[in-house]
From Swiss-Prot:
UniProt GO molecular function: beta-catenin binding; cadherin binding; calcium ion binding
Pfam families named in the record: CADH_Y-type_LIR (PF01049), Cadherin (PF00028), Cadherin_pro (PF08758)
Location of the Cadherin domain: 161-268, 269-383, 384-498, 499-604, 605-713
Subunit note: Homodimer (via extracellular region). Can also form heterodimers with other cadherins (via extracellular region). Dimerization occurs in trans, i.e. with a cadherin chain from another cell.
Name of the protein in its database record: Cadherin-2B
Function as written in the Swiss-Prot or TrEMBL entry: Calcium-dependent cell adhesion protein; preferentially mediates homotypic cell-cell adhesion. Cadherins may thus contribute to the sorting of heterogeneous cell types, and thereby play an important role during embryonic development. Required for proper neurite branching. Required for pre- and postsynaptic organization.
Glycosylation sites: N191, N274, N326, N403, N573, N623, N651, N692
Region (Disordered) location: 774-800, 862-883
Gene name of this polypeptide: cdh2-b
Membrane disposition: Single-pass type I membrane protein
Main location (coarse class): membrane
Length: 905
């Protein structure tokens, strides 16, 4: 009994069922015969209704390659009506009614590598319209047997393993589950009670329970829809055991392939694709590749994609500017006319469709391709003017004299737009250069070498503008790419300059003052300004020279001396200044170098000038050298001689060793301790020669191990005049300082005594604490003790004052120093009259304000942070105040109340 199956299931599971209907199925797959490549049936049958729809599956033809993994391609003999996919499923190519003539056709299978060809016949049985059969076009469920064979001895031997064709199950199957796929049985089930089972992924391994088997009947079923994108195939093993669990058959392998269905829509890797192409590209130029993927089997039509362009925006130059390879997704140009100046960007809508691009039953998706038209140098730069003007002061460098402006239609800030300027004429000496401003693309004409107005006052430059990249082929430069620059040089006051500078002259030393040396003159480059030049001395270290301010004549002011400290390597340098009369005046410097020729003006002298020898010298000779400030030929070789005096000079002799060296030898064996001054007469080789007698100071000392240990007393020596004068000056200065100190001390004592005589003991406050809280006793200007003024020398001592009366600022009571008695005071009457007259005059003075009068202060402004101190103001009239409250103060204030109450009394 057959249960209802999905529409393709019986066909996919009927591989062996068809074989078992034929004679000897075992011979086809078992026994000694090997697997044969080809269709599993000679004729395939399908039962369908007359009317079919495009894409409707009709049946499945099975082809086996015996596991050799051949690449098989299928085709029908009537592709107009029927087509076949890579899994062997036959579909209707169009919607039509099948005629009897169309009900039979051939299916071809060809090896793509060897081109070997197989074919099989397909016969379609037309069903009546009222018939409803759940197994349309399919056979009954396949049955797979565990087959054995007995030999002549009655022993069983296992047959060779079967090659079981795969079981194909479509994914996403609908219907009632579980759905039976195949039946597994053994020939021994007639005699034994067997139990069947399956193992492997999908059965007892994850995912567990996808496939189940009836342990008694052997029906293998699938329990749920399959998804090829998750698992494309399952490898199971079928087992047969008896009720005791003993294996009665060897396991057989079962492969279940999940047949792909078109359940995945193509997906582009990017929703927006960006590409670029240079403008002016020829048709057929590659732009970019767009790619989409499909989750379905890429080897089947479900996963085979086809591309096409749905739209192009904008449709300028050509509505079909681009095309796409429908299989690879390569976008190429189809038409000419790409111009960035017209269209900078194209937007394409790309569609990818599976089922090999079938628009009816294929799934599709879209993406956007943005193609930027990149710039090429197809527009030369053009100057905005034919002539540009500029001016520059002479002798200025790194100055921009003119701005050159150009226009370029190419894309800004690209090599095709960036301008490069060149000077092609009018600047033979290379005094100008043109730099490009990176932002504005302007050309900056710059002076790179000084320009002399007196040499050339106007420059006419010819310049051209180009780009960083060459123009594309076929584009020529225009006349507007060349321009003229007129540069005017402005005359400025320039520095005078000496020529030659430095100036070298040769002169013998010893030239006296007021002698002319040379003329050192300067020139003014501003020959059109008619200016005068004046000269002055800038540097003359030895102050030997002066220069005439008008004509530059240099004369000496002192004797030139080659041996001066200011002369280096016989050369003396002086610097002079030349200043013109321009506004502002400009100046330049020049150096005069005087090479001084030597004359014999320096006598030679002995070196060293002091030596030490032992009293018994060994050797008894002293090496000496003659030095001369002059140079050859006015120096060596020298002549060394000893004079005839003093007498002890006879103990010595001198012998010349070379032109500059000699040896002073002692004729006797020893000398007494002391210091000996040996005169040596030396003559140079100058013409005329110069000679000099210099003294060699020889110190004779006691020696230990050939070194002096003690110094002998000085013989015939004493203090020099300079030393004696210095000692006397020191003594005089010391005595003067002592005398000045004594005088200052005496004067200070006298001043101290004079101060003590003038100080009154009563007024000597010093550092005592003053007490100022005594009040009363009348006015101090009237209450005074006249007796103190009359006889100050007879005032009472402090001891007779009452206790508590003595002021704190008075001296404490102790013995006071005795001072000389002052002269007698004037007559007391005179002092009293003087004081009384002054007091009377003060009292009668009408201009003197009384102490209790209202003081008037100057107005110092408002806004004091301390506020106003005059909070009580006088009323302008008596009626403005109410003084009735004074009557409530009692009888004591009655008089005050009467005064302010306005009473008539």
């Amino acid at each position: 009994m057959c249960r209802k199956q999905p529409f393709l299931l019986p066909t996919l599971l009927g591989i062996l069922a068809a074989l078992m209907l034929q004679q000897g199925p075992v011979e086809a797959f078992g026994g000694s015969r090997l697997c044969k490549t080809g269709f599993l049936e000679d004729v395939y049958h399908a039962s369908v209704y007359r009317s079919v729809h495009e894409g409707q599956p009709l049946l499945n033809v099975m082809f086996t390659d015996c596991g050799t993994d051949r690449r098989i391609q299928y085709e029908t003999s009537n592709p107009t009506d029927f087509r076949i996919d890579g899994d062997g499923i036959v579909f209707a190519s169009r919607t039509f009614d099948i005629s009897p003539e169309q009900a039979e056709f051939l299916v071809y299978a060809q090896d793509e590598d060897t081109r070997e060809l197989w074919h099989v016949t397909v016969k379609i049985t037309l069903r009546p319209p009222h018939e409803h059969h759940s197994h349309q076009g399919f056979h009954k469920v396949r049955e797979i047997k565990f087959s054995t064979q007995r030999n002549s001895n009655g022993l069983q031997r296992q047959k060779r393993d079967w090659v079981i064709p795969p079981i194909n199950v479509p994914e996403n199957a609908r219907g009632t589950f579980p759905q039976e796929l195949v039946r597994i049985r053994s020939d021994r089930d007639k005699n034994l009670s067997l139990r069947y089972s399956v193992t492997g992924p999908g059965a007892d391994q994850p995912p567990i329970g996808v496939f189940i088997i009836n342990p008694i009947g052997g029906q293998l079923s699938v329990t749920k829809p399959l998804d090829r994108e998750q698992i494309a195939n399952f490898h199971l093993r079928a087992h047969a055991v008896d009720v005791n669990g003993n294996q009665v058959e060897n396991p057989i392998d079962i492969v279940i392939n999940v047949i792909d269905m078109n359940d995945n829509r193509p997906e582009f890797l990017h929703q927006i694709w960006n590409g670029s192409i240079p403008e002016g590209s020829k048709p057929g130029t590659y732009v970019m590749t767009v790619t989409a993927i499909d989750g379905d089997d890429p080897k089947q039509p479900n996963g085979m994609l086809r591309y096409k362009i749905l739209s192009q925006t904008p449709a300028i130059s050509s509505p079909n500017m681009f095309t796409i390879n429908n299989e690879t997704g390569d976008i190429i140009t189809l038409a000419a006319g790409l111009d960035r100046e017209k269209v900078q960007r194209y937007t394409l809508i790309i569609q990818a469709t599976d089922m090999e691009g079938n628009p009816t039953y294929g799934l599709s998706n879209t993406a956007t391709a943005v193609i930027a038209v990149t710039d090429v140098n197809d527009n030369p730069p053009e100057f905005t003017a034919m002539t540009f003007y500029g001016e520059v002061p002479e002798n200025r460098v790194d100055v921009v004299v003119a701005n050159l402006t150009v226009t370029d239609k190419d894309q800004p800030h690209t090599p095709a737009w960036n301008a490069v300027y060149r000077i092609v004429g009018g600047d033979g000496t290379g005094r100008f250069a043109i730099k490009t401003d990176a932002n504005s693309n302007d050309g900056l004409v710059t002076v790179v070498k000084p320009i002399d107005y007196e040499t050339k006052s106007t420059y006419i430059l010819t310049v051209v503008a180009e780009n960083q990249v060459d123009l594309i082929r076929g584009i020529q430069f225009k006349p507007e790419s060349t321009a003229t620059v007129s540069v005017t040089v402005i005359d400025v006051n320039e520095n005078p300059y000496f020529t030659p500078n430095p100036k070298l002259i040769r002169q013998e030393e010893g030239l006296f003052a007021s002698k002319m040396l040379t003329t050192f003159s300067a020139q003014d480059p501003d020959r059109y300004m008619q200016q005068t030049i004046r000269y002055s001395k800038l540097s003359d270290p030895a102050n030997w020279l002066k220069i005439d301010p008008v004509n530059g004549l240099i004369t000496t002011t002192a004797v030139l001396d080659r041996e001066s400290m200011y002369v280096k390597n016989n050369m003396y340098n002086a610097t002079f200044l030349a200043t013109d009369s321009g506004i502002p005046p400009m100046s330049g410097t020049g150096t005069l170098q005087i090479y001084l020729l030597d004359i014999n003006d320096n006598a030679p002298y002995v070196y060293p000038q002091e030596v030490e020898i032992c009293e018994r010298p060994d050797p008894n000779a002293i090496n000496i050298t003659a030095l001369d400030a002059d140079i050859n030929p006015n120096s060596g070789p020298f002549i060394f001689e000893l004079p005839y005096s003093p007498m002890d000079i006879k103990n010595w002799t001198v012998t010349r060793l070379s032109g500059d060296h000699a040896q002073l030898s002692l004729k006797i064996g020893s000398l007494d301790y002391g210091i000996y001054n040996i005169p040596i007469h030396i003559t140079d080789s100058g013409n005329p020669a110069m000679s000099n007698t210099s003294y060699l100071r020889v110190k004779v000392c006691s020696c230990e191990h050939e070194y002096c240990s003690t110094t002998a007393p000085i013989i015939g020596t004493g203090l020099g005049t300079g030393a004696i004068i210095a000692i006397l000056l020191c003594i005089i200065i010391l005595l003067t300082l002592v005398l000045m100190f004594v005088v200052w001390m005496k004067r200070r004592d006298k001043e101290r005594q004079a101060k003590q005589l003038l100080i009154d003991p009563e007024d000597d406050v010093r550092d005592n604490i003053l007490k100022y809280d005594e009040e009363g006793g009348g006015e101090e200007d009237q209450d005074y003790d006249l007796s103190q003024l009359q006889q100050p020398d007879t005032m009472e001592p402090d001891t007779i004052k009452p206790v508590g009366i003595r002021r704190m600022d008075e001296r404490p009571i102790h013995a006071e120093p005795q001072y000389p008695i002052r002269s007698a005071a004037p007559h007391p009457g005179d002092i009293g009259d003087f004081i009384n007259e002054g007091l009377k005059a003060a009292d009668n003075d009408p201009t003197a304000p009384p102490y209790d009068s209202l003081l008037v202060f100057d107005y110092e402004g408002s806004g004091s942070t301390a506020g106003s101190l005059s909070s009580l103001n006088s009323s302008s009239s008596g009626g403005e105040q109410d003084y009735d409250y004074l009557n409530d103060w009692g009888p004591r204030f009655k008089k005050l109340a009467d005064m302010y109450g306005g009473s008539d009394d």
